[in-house]
Amino acid sequence: MNGLRERGCAQRPRPARATAAARLGTLLTALLPVAAPALAAGYPPPVEGDFILKDFRFASGESLPQLRIHYRTFGQPRADASGVVRNAVLIMHGTGGSGGSLVREEFAGELFGPGQPLDTTRYFIVLPDGIGHGRSSKPSDGLRGHFPHYGYNDMVQAQYLLLTQGLKVNHARLIMGTSMGGMHTWLWGEQHPQFMDALMPLASLPAQISGRNRVWRRTIIDAIRHDPDWKGGEYQAEPPSLRTALEMLWLMGSNPVLRYQEAPNLARADEVIDAYVAHGMQTEDANDLLYALAASSDYDPGPGLAKIAAPLMAVNSADDLINPPELGILEREIGRVPHGRAAVIPFRENTHGHGSHTHAVLWKQHLDELLRSPQR
């Protein structure tokens, strides 16, 4: 399966991107390189590929003649005597991230090695780059502000087609995701209730984006859209509003204690945020971020929670500014999921606010327990 560039669109030169420096899933955590190579962690490097979806139609009515979905896989699929794949695991990243942003010591290093919960000798692990992210088709490839407006439902549909058509996976042992990927997990359970044995959404809520979670997203969206240097998405240099976006992402991505430890006085705070923004201005794209945040507008799993048939374990953290437990949403809504359970990780020295979703040591015991549930 070959990669592509959008038809009829010349690419403007851009600096090289660091896919491990992701926005909400990992950029919100920290703009850091991926940890040591996979082999050093005891699991093999991923196999990478591109799946091309022809004439993909978005819920908006827009379409692309070719939609590229990039992916990484670990391990090999195994089917039973009836041809049903029994060991596939789909893991979906957060906003602005990529599948590669999860191939790092604190996530894959805790899960993919020998004897670990998702040992790659036992499981076939699929890490896709969502629409608009990583090396999948995205605005900065060339269409810029003319890229189709995608939503979370479009992203889930593309993931489903990648598994079923591209990788010939007809069943999943587990579907899980972090942040945006966690929200996708809820949608997967509703839209394809018989496809998986188990579900694990991390750092997400089964409800429409609202309150502070909507407002911080709107702050970034409005800053970019009302920036005259954005030029309707046709800029040649990143608009100044990307700085505002990066500052907001830094604010929301961790907990106040960690941020204070990183920046304990005025001078140090300015140094830290200046360095973070300077790096992001070289690696991030305003259109890509704008589209990625706007994509959450169609997220509304609430009405369909009773459709989820598989055992589901939702995990959030008490110091998550984006999904604060004080709202009581997770505790209230999990009762509507027939086989749903939820846990909130208490605030402690090794939690990372919203970014706790990437630190598997905090929650992998819940994954172990979930994987002990029977296959369906």
Language-model regions: role of each:
Residues 288-304:
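Active-site nucleophile elbow and catalytic-triad environment of alpha/beta-hydrolase enzymes
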Residues 72-141:
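N-terminal cap/lid subdomain of alpha/beta-hydrolase-fold enzymes
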Residues 340-376:
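Catalytic active-site module of serine/aspartate enzymes centered on a nucleophile-bearing elbow/loop
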Residues 153-173:
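Conserved acidic catalytic loop of the alpha/beta-hydrolase fold
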Residues 321-328:
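Conserved alpha/beta-hydrolase "acid-adjacent" motif
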Residues 171-210:
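Conserved hydrolase catalytic core segment
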Residues 308, 314-316:
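Short beta-strand/loop motif that positions the catalytic acidic residue
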Residues 195-279:
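Alpha/beta-hydrolase-fold enzymes
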